[in-house]
Amino acid sequence: MPLLNTITTPYAEAFLQVAESKKEVEKIIAQAKSILQLWDESSELREAMGSPVLEVESKKAALEKIFSGKVTPSFLNFMKLLAERQRIGFLNSVLERLLELYRAQRNIALATVTSATPLNEDQQAALLKNVQSVAGTNNLELNLKVDPDLIGGFVVRVGSKVIDASLSGQVRRMGLELAKVT
């Protein structure tokens, strides 16, 4: 996605610099994660912000109404700037890039854990400890997802490493082995 990075990186870098200058980095990062979740869950928001029919001022007013008091003023201004520059449709990509830059700056590895059922705190703690050894760092961020199609177990992704300890993965591997035999 080099083209997308040429759009998202300058905005993400600039916003990270603003957050650092205002000493709001941790707050901005937490808000970015929340907004990304909202963006993923709300097709109406994505469609409205990405719509070429909706006027820029209407988009800015909608952002103000939705996010005022829920995000820092600098975050709201950032989103309005994206709307003004016809880039609000890329909000998720810009925020993803922001998180990547933040993690890179602080040497934080991202581990995506997909489980068949939600993990309780004890399971998360145990998994975090094991994933830290696989990742080779204690500075780790867990991104938890649930996918009932896994049937049981979990799949962990850290960079290019994948650990598939899911029941569906075991069934798939067993099927491949059986196919080799026949």
Swiss-Prot record:
Chief location: membrane
Family in the record: Belongs to the ATPase delta chain family.
Biological role: F(1)F(0) ATP synthase produces ATP from ADP in the presence of a proton or sodium gradient. F-type ATPases consist of two structural domains, F(1) containing the extramembraneous catalytic core and F(0) containing the membrane proton channel, linked together by a central stalk and a peripheral stalk. During catalysis, ATP synthesis in the catalytic domain of F(1) is coupled via a rotary mechanism of the central stalk subunits to proton translocation. This protein is part of the stalk that links CF(0) to CF(1). It either transmits conformational changes from CF(0) to CF(1) or is implicated in proton conduction.
Membrane-protein topology: Peripheral membrane protein
GO molecular function, a single term: proton-transporting ATP synthase activity, rotational mechanism
Alphabetical list of InterPro entries matching this protein: ATP_synth_OSCP/delta_N_sf, ATPase_OSCP/d_CS, ATPase_OSCP/dsu
Protein encoded by which gene: atpH
UniProt cross-references to Pfam families, sorted A to Z: OSCP (PF00213)
Keyword Transport recorded: yes
Key words of the record: ATP synthesis, CF(1), Hydrogen ion transport, Ion transport, Membrane, Thylakoid, Transport
Protein name, per record: ATP synthase subunit delta
One GO location term (cellular component): plasma membrane-derived thylakoid membrane
Subunit structure, as described in the record: F-type ATPases have 2 components, F(1) - the catalytic core - and F(0) - the membrane proton channel. F(1) has five subunits: alpha(3), beta(3), gamma(1), delta(1), epsilon(1). CF(0) has four main subunits: a(1), b(1), b'(1) and c(10-14). The alpha and beta chains form an alternating ring which encloses part of the gamma chain. F(1) is attached to F(0) by a central stalk formed by the gamma and epsilon chains, while a peripheral stalk is formed by the delta, b and b' chains.
Subcellular location: Cellular thylakoid membrane
Domain of life per record: Bacteria
